[in-house]
């Protein structure tokens, strides 16, 4: 695997990791749906993993941290845990990638470096899946409630920017992890012993046919 490809994969994975952190912090997983009587409302409601915010038409915003975890919907409760685990897993994957990088001297053996890089790629892939699951789950819940006639219009929500950031972060980590997993260990060179046969030098003199150093005329 070339160093350029390794750096590209690591950079994409790091961008995805930073995107996951932004996705976790943004209070815009769910936003007010301006339908029906909500069209003329003077405020916009944002709901995130840790707080909800009310934005007035004047631009003033008030945010409040959730008082109880049990008051959250199931998808947001699961999203909290999965997103935090994804962030920690990607951070550990970054440390592993730095250890196995070709530009570092933490490990001298090239084969060991390649295996460590593959482990880092797998960690980034797992982090991407842990990010993708809660984001997609929340989006599915929002869409299902939006088209549910039983849910009042005031409680219907639309997908916020946090979900789109989460999808982009998961895609970057998937791509970066896949590139790191392409790091194949170098093949070991096998040397085969070659047999060398030594033969005595053959004499080309006149007495070579008799196997002695005398000339033929000495026997006449």
UniProtKB/Swiss-Prot annotation:
It comes from the Eukaryota. It comes from Homo sapiens. One of its GO terms (molecular function) is cell-cell adhesion mediator activity. PANTHER family: CLAUDIN. It is found in: Cell junction, Tight junction; Cell membrane. Can form homo- and heteropolymers with other CLDN. Homopolymers interact with CLDN1 and CLDN2 homopolymers. Interacts in cis (within the same plasma membrane) with CLDN19. Directly interacts with TJP1/ZO-1, TJP2/ZO-2 and TJP3/ZO-3. Keywords: Cell junction, Cell membrane, Membrane, Phosphoprotein, Tight junction, Transmembrane, Transmembrane helix, Williams-Beuren syndrome. Residues 219-220 are annotated as: Interactions with TJP1, TJP2 and TJP3. Belongs to the claudin family. GO terms for biological process: actin cytoskeleton organization; bicellular tight junction assembly; calcium-independent cell-cell adhesion via plasma membrane cell-adhesion molecules; cell adhesion; cell junction assembly; cell junction maintenance; cell-cell junction maintenance; epithelial cell morphogenesis. The modification Phosphotyrosine is found at residue 198. The modification Phosphoserine is found at residues 199, 209. GO terms for cellular component: apical junction complex; apicolateral plasma membrane; bicellular tight junction; cell-cell junction; lateral plasma membrane; membrane; plasma membrane; protein-containing complex. InterPro entries: Claudin (IPR006187), Claudin3 (IPR003549), Claudin_CS (IPR017974), PMP22/EMP/MP20/Claudin (IPR004031). Residues 1-8, 102-115, 181-220 are cytoplasmic. This is Claudin-3. It is linked to CLDN3 is located in the Williams-Beuren syndrome (WBS) critical region. WBS results from a hemizygous deletion of several genes on chromosome 7q11.23, thought to arise as a consequence of unequal crossing over between highly homologous low-copy repeat sequences flanking the deleted region.
């Amino acid at each position: 695997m070339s160093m350029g490809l390794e750096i590209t994969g690591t950079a994409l994975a790091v961008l995805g990791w930073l995107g996951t952190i932004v996705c976790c912090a943004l209070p815009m997983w769910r936003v007010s749906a301006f339908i029906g009587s909500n069209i003329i409302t003077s405020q916009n409601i944002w709901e995130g993993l840790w707080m909800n915010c009310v934005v007035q038409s004047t631009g003033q915003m008030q945010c409040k941290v959730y008082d109880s975890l049990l008051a959250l919907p199931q998808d947001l409760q699961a999203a909290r845990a999965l997103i935090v685990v994804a962030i920690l897993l990607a951070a550990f994957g970054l440390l592993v990638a730095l250890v196995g990088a070709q530009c570092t001297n933490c490990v001298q053996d090239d084969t060991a470096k390649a295996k460590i890089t593959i482990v880092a790629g797998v960690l980034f892939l797992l982090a991407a899946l842990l990010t993708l699951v809660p984001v997609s789950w929340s989006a599915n819940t929002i869409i299902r409630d939006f088209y549910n006639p039983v849910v009042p219009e005031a409680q219907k929500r639309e997908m916020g920017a946090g979900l789109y950031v989460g999808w982009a972060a998961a895609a970057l980590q998937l791509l970066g992890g896949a590139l790191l997993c392409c790091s194949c260990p170098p093949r070991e060179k096998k040397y085969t012993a070659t047999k060398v046969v030594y033969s005595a030098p053959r004499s080309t003199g006149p007495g070579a046919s008799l196997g002695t150093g005398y000339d033929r005329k000495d026997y006449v």
